[in-house]
Amino acid sequence: MKNTLFRINELSKKEKATGLTVDEKQEQQMLRQNYTQTFRGSLDSILLNTKIVDQNGLNVTPAALQDAQIRLKLSK
């Protein structure tokens, strides 16, 4: 993922400085799309394994998140 982000930034700098070729522009779009999918997947994984508890020890996880967690457990 670090290499992908490095390449995205490298292409962005080049785009600002001199512009990109058609191939580089396609590569940039593909890298950004892949990076976004990976990032969202990681965030989903983190959220689906999160439980929110108030200072009294009560589970205050939002209902929508609890529903998603239940659906995930049922699909496994």
UniProtKB/Swiss-Prot annotation:
Keyword RNA-binding recorded: no
Main location class: cytoplasm
InterPro entries: DUF896 (IPR009242)
Protein origin, superkingdom: Bacteria
Cellular localisation: Cytoplasm
Keywords of this entry: Cytoplasm
GO CC annotation, single: cytoplasm
Membrane-spanning parts: none
Pfam assignment, any one: DUF896
Recorded family membership: Belongs to the UPF0291 family.
Record-given protein name: UPF0291 protein BA_1897/GBAA_1897/BAS1759
